[in-house]
Amino acid sequence: MADTVALKVSGLDVHYKDFQALWDVSIEVNAGQVVSIIGANGAGKSTLLNTTSGLSTPTKGTIEFLGDRIDGQPPHETVARGVSLVPEGRRVFPRLTVYENLFIGSYTPKSRPKREQILGTIYELFPVLKERRNQMSDTLSGGEQQMLAIGRALMSEPKLILCDEISLGLAPVIIAGIYKRLRQINEDGITIVLVEQDITRSLKAANYAYILLEGKVVLEGEPSVMTEEQVKKAYFGM
């Protein structure tokens, strides 16, 4: 039986005024996979996620989620279809409590009636969020804020989450804990696209990987068959 394609990006170009950020990018993500998008700063990784989530508009190409076109849709419609973004830099609402930040994530018609049930699941995954639920989010540590950003994305009951640089600025022990939770999330049936600069960790977590360089896909494949030399050449453009 063929794998179900959750996300299909075909021939994507994205411009910011006169600057072209993505050039004919195509990727496929099967349902249930963890797919890693790797590249240095400026490679176009965040642009790819932002365009998939509806925050940016492509100038060419298509994006399909479970067979339906989602390119050019506003972000709230993309979320309602089952795609959630964990943005770079966490972007929690600083003067709202942990609970209020999570509450905001459950605004879709599907998730609203089950808000308390979903909250319980998030609290099981990240017990510290339950402990600090009445605390202002700007008083949390960086790792706790990242847990909150992931929890908020999960409140809409997504089928796919797009994680943008979730290890940025965090201590290795905290990163290890967050990646452990990501494995649990994936084992619960949620497909994950993971954007990272950390080559080793992201390849270890993924079933499949794409490497971007200057807005183009320069290498793709299963991490287990990618050689260190291939990855270095693709990442650094050697």
Task: List the predicted regions and their residue ranges.
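Conserved catalytic motifs of ABC-family nucleotide-binding domains
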Residues: 157
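Helix-to-loop junction immediately C-terminal to a conserved catalytic motif
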Residues: 53
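The feature captures the beta-strand-to-loop junction immediately N-terminal to the Walker
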Residues: 38-40
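ABC ATPase C-loop
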Residues: 153-154
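Conserved ABC transporter NBD signature motif
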Residues: 61-70, 81, 114-119, 219-221
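Conserved ABC ATPase signature
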Residues: 136-140, 144
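ABC-type ATPase nucleotide-binding domains, specifically the catalytic core motifs of the NBD
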Residues: 17, 73, 98-117, 125-130, ...
